[in-house]
Protein backbone atom coordinates (compact mmCIF):
# COMPACT_ATOMS: atom_id res chain seq x y z
CA UNK A 1 0.00 0.00 0.00
CA UNK A 2 2.98 2.30 0.42
CA UNK A 3 3.24 2.38 -3.37
CA UNK A 4 0.18 4.63 -3.77
CA UNK A 5 2.47 7.49 -4.78
CA UNK A 6 4.21 5.29 -7.33
CA UNK A 7 1.12 5.45 -9.52
CA UNK A 8 2.12 9.04 -10.21
CA UNK A 9 -0.21 11.62 -11.60
CA UNK A 10 -2.81 10.30 -13.94
CA UNK A 11 -6.00 11.50 -15.46
CA UNK A 12 -7.63 8.14 -16.03
CA UNK A 13 -10.75 7.78 -13.92
CA UNK A 14 -9.83 4.15 -13.28
CA UNK A 15 -6.39 5.04 -11.95
CA UNK A 16 -7.74 7.89 -9.83
CA UNK A 17 -10.28 5.47 -8.37
CA UNK A 18 -7.52 2.91 -7.78
CA UNK A 19 -5.44 5.50 -5.92
CA UNK A 20 -8.43 6.39 -3.75
CA UNK A 21 -9.04 2.71 -3.00
CA UNK A 22 -5.38 2.23 -2.05
CA UNK A 23 -5.51 5.25 0.27
CA UNK A 24 -8.61 3.85 1.94
CA UNK A 25 -6.88 0.46 2.23
CA UNK A 26 -3.89 2.13 3.91
CA UNK A 27 -6.22 3.87 6.36
CA UNK A 28 -7.96 0.58 7.21
CA UNK A 29 -4.58 -1.10 7.67
CA UNK A 30 -3.39 1.66 10.02
CA UNK A 31 -6.58 1.37 12.06
CA UNK A 32 -6.18 -2.41 12.31
CA UNK A 33 -2.56 -2.03 13.42
CA UNK A 34 -3.64 0.40 16.14
CA UNK A 35 -6.10 -2.14 17.51
CA UNK A 36 -3.51 -4.92 17.25
CA UNK A 37 -1.15 -2.89 19.46
CA UNK A 38 -3.97 -2.36 21.96
CA UNK A 39 -4.68 -6.11 21.94
CA UNK A 40 -1.01 -6.87 22.60
CA UNK A 41 -1.05 -4.53 25.59
CA UNK A 42 -4.26 -6.05 26.94
CA UNK A 43 -2.86 -9.57 26.52
CA UNK A 44 0.24 -8.59 28.49
CA UNK A 45 -1.96 -7.21 31.26
CA UNK A 46 -4.10 -10.35 31.15
CA UNK A 47 -0.97 -12.45 31.66
CA UNK A 48 0.06 -10.23 34.58
CA UNK A 49 -3.36 -10.72 36.17
CA UNK A 50 -3.14 -14.50 35.64
CA UNK A 51 0.24 -14.54 37.39
CA UNK A 52 -1.17 -12.53 40.30
CA UNK A 53 -4.16 -14.84 40.55
CA UNK A 54 -1.85 -17.84 40.76
CA UNK A 55 0.19 -16.19 43.52
CA UNK A 56 -2.95 -15.20 45.44
CA UNK A 57 -4.31 -18.75 45.23
CA UNK A 58 -1.01 -20.12 46.52
CA UNK A 59 -1.08 -17.65 49.42
CA UNK A 60 -4.72 -18.55 50.13
CA UNK A 61 -3.78 -22.24 50.27
CA UNK A 62 -0.90 -21.45 52.62
CA UNK A 63 -3.28 -19.52 54.89
CA UNK A 64 -5.76 -22.40 54.77
CA UNK A 65 -3.09 -24.99 55.60
CA UNK A 66 -1.64 -22.96 58.47
CA UNK A 67 -5.01 -21.76 59.77
CA UNK A 68 -3.54 -18.26 59.91
CA UNK A 69 -2.85 -15.37 57.57
CA UNK A 70 -0.51 -14.71 54.69
CA UNK A 71 0.60 -11.32 53.43
CA UNK A 72 -0.52 -9.82 50.14
CA UNK A 73 2.58 -8.88 48.13
CA UNK A 74 3.09 -5.14 47.70
CA UNK A 75 3.00 -5.33 43.88
CA UNK A 76 -0.36 -7.12 43.94
CA UNK A 77 -1.79 -4.55 46.33
CA UNK A 78 -0.45 -1.67 44.20
CA UNK A 79 -1.94 -3.22 41.05
CA UNK A 80 -5.30 -3.69 42.74
CA UNK A 81 -5.28 -0.11 44.06
CA UNK A 82 -4.27 1.28 40.66
CA UNK A 83 -7.15 -0.55 38.95
CA UNK A 84 -9.70 0.09 41.73
CA UNK A 85 -10.04 -3.62 42.49
CA UNK A 86 -11.44 -4.66 45.85
CA UNK A 87 -9.70 -6.66 48.53
CA UNK A 88 -10.35 -7.20 52.21
CA UNK A 89 -9.62 -4.13 54.33
CA UNK A 90 -9.86 -5.82 57.72
CA UNK A 91 -7.43 -4.46 60.29
CA UNK A 92 -6.83 -5.08 63.92
CA UNK A 93 -9.02 -2.66 65.87
CA UNK A 94 -9.75 0.03 63.24
CA UNK A 95 -13.52 0.62 63.13
CA UNK A 96 -13.77 1.94 59.55
CA UNK A 97 -10.78 0.54 57.68
CA UNK A 98 -9.54 2.17 54.49
CA UNK A 99 -6.89 1.11 52.01
CA UNK A 100 -4.46 3.31 53.90
CA UNK A 101 -5.17 1.75 57.32
CA UNK A 102 -5.70 -1.84 56.16
CA UNK A 103 -3.05 -4.42 56.78
CA UNK A 104 -1.84 -6.77 54.05
CA UNK A 105 -2.58 -9.91 56.05
CA UNK A 106 -5.36 -12.15 54.79
CA UNK A 107 -6.81 -15.40 56.02
CA UNK A 108 -8.28 -18.00 53.66
CA UNK A 109 -11.70 -16.31 53.47
CA UNK A 110 -10.28 -12.80 53.08
CA UNK A 111 -8.27 -13.97 50.07
CA UNK A 112 -11.56 -14.82 48.31
CA UNK A 113 -12.36 -11.10 47.96
CA UNK A 114 -9.08 -10.34 46.17
CA UNK A 115 -9.23 -13.48 44.02
CA UNK A 116 -12.81 -12.82 42.88
CA UNK A 117 -11.94 -9.21 42.10
CA UNK A 118 -8.92 -10.26 40.01
CA UNK A 119 -11.00 -12.89 38.19
CA UNK A 120 -13.67 -10.32 37.30
CA UNK A 121 -10.98 -7.93 36.05
CA UNK A 122 -9.41 -10.71 33.98
CA UNK A 123 -12.80 -11.44 32.38
CA UNK A 124 -13.22 -7.74 31.59
CA UNK A 125 -9.84 -7.71 29.85
CA UNK A 126 -10.80 -10.84 27.90
CA UNK A 127 -14.04 -9.24 26.73
CA UNK A 128 -12.16 -6.10 25.71
CA UNK A 129 -9.68 -8.19 23.70
CA UNK A 130 -12.51 -10.01 21.91
CA UNK A 131 -14.21 -6.72 21.03
CA UNK A 132 -10.97 -5.31 19.63
CA UNK A 133 -10.39 -8.47 17.61
CA UNK A 134 -13.79 -7.96 15.97
CA UNK A 135 -12.69 -4.44 15.02
CA UNK A 136 -9.43 -5.79 13.58
CA UNK A 137 -11.36 -8.32 11.49
CA UNK A 138 -13.63 -5.55 10.24
CA UNK A 139 -10.68 -3.37 9.22
CA UNK A 140 -9.00 -6.35 7.55
CA UNK A 141 -12.18 -6.95 5.56
CA UNK A 142 -12.22 -3.29 4.53
CA UNK A 143 -8.54 -3.50 3.57
CA UNK A 144 -9.18 -6.55 1.38
CA UNK A 145 -12.21 -4.93 -0.22
CA UNK A 146 -10.34 -1.71 -1.01
CA UNK A 147 -7.31 -3.50 -2.47
CA UNK A 148 -9.58 -5.68 -4.62
CA UNK A 149 -11.36 -2.54 -5.80
CA UNK A 150 -8.04 -0.95 -6.68
CA UNK A 151 -6.88 -4.04 -8.56
CA UNK A 152 -10.15 -4.21 -10.50
CA UNK A 153 -9.90 -0.53 -11.43
CA UNK A 154 -6.29 -0.94 -12.59
CA UNK A 155 -7.17 -4.01 -14.67
CA UNK A 156 -10.10 -2.17 -16.22
CA UNK A 157 -7.88 0.80 -17.01
CA UNK A 158 -5.24 -1.46 -18.55
CA UNK A 159 -7.85 -3.17 -20.72
CA UNK A 160 -9.06 0.23 -21.91
CA UNK A 161 -5.50 1.34 -22.72
CA UNK A 162 -4.81 -1.93 -24.53
CA UNK A 163 -8.00 -1.55 -26.57
CA UNK A 164 -7.07 2.05 -27.47
CA UNK A 165 -3.54 0.98 -28.44
CA UNK A 166 -4.95 -1.71 -30.73
CA UNK A 167 -7.33 0.78 -32.26
CA UNK A 168 -10.44 -1.04 -31.12
Where are these regions (language model features)?
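Short, compositionally biased, intrinsically disordered N-terminal export/targeting signals
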Residues: 1-37, 150, 163-168
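Extended interaction regions within the primary functional domain
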Residues: 43, 47-51, 103, 156-159, ...
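Exposed alpha-helical structural elements
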Residues: 48, 75, 110-113, 117, ...
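Residue-level detector of alpha-helix boundaries and kinks
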Residues: 13, 20, 121, 134-135
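Extended, non-globular alpha-helical segments
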Residues: 84-126
Amino acid sequence: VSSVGSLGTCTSVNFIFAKLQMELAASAKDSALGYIKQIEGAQAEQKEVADMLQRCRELQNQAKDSGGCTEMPADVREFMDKNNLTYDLTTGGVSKPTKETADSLHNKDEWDVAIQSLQAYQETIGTDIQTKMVYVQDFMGQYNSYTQGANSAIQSGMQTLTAVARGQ
